[in-house]
Curated annotation (Swiss-Prot):
Forms the tail multi-ring barrel with ring protein 2, ring protein 3 and ring protein 4. The keyword ATP-binding does not apply. It comes from Bacteroides phage crAss001 (Bacteroides phage PhiCrAss001). Signal peptide: none annotated. This is Ring protein 1. Its main location: virion.
Amino acid sequence: MVNNINWVKLPVILDRLLRHPLLTDLNLETAIQYTLDFISAMGLPNVYVDKIETIDIKEYRGELPCDLISINQVRLHKNGIALRAMTDNFNAYPTHDHKEGDWYERGEPSFKTQGRVIFTSIKHEKVDISYKAIMLDDEGLPLIPDNPIFLKTLELYIKKEWFTILFDMGKISPAVLNNTQQEYAFKAGQCNNEFVIPSVSEMEAITNMWNQLIPRVTEFRRGFKNLGDKEYIRVH
């Protein structure tokens, strides 16, 4: 896995694509759409950045960050207690107010999301959301990793999608499209290995997780802070 990622602006990949005579009609808007589709389809964790944002919960709900892709974890801002996923079908729509300290408030706090809204089991609170987002530049355009394998794979993906349209219109032969599809298939596998295979440090943390005699059942509450620590056995 790539440990250190530098970022470049999307026009870099667009300039490379426009060198091809069959891609001269490609514009920035289309390139952005294909880039977001590619990032979503590949699901590479290092392509996203981790962010933490504190939001206000009012009347059991709050507004999620606009750049949120997926939620890592949610916790209460005041004491760091983690919220689990909501399992109550009616928890997000309570029929009456609950006083602080009653049986309802003493249960485990929970949350669920619908669209750009987060619902919690607590009426008024501040929560910290750890989430993954796409890296953006000052103009709000997505930044992409400055990695030669990633750039080539993205270039072939956009080329493949554009050539599919040209093939449907009868402007290119099947051999041209098949060659691009084959190139992309091989490069996609290489890109996946480049970004998914753990580094030596990550392998050490994974090994420590597996080699445990006593299961750690409280790591969720701590945000998995100590999950990768080595377990020591004291012999008295």
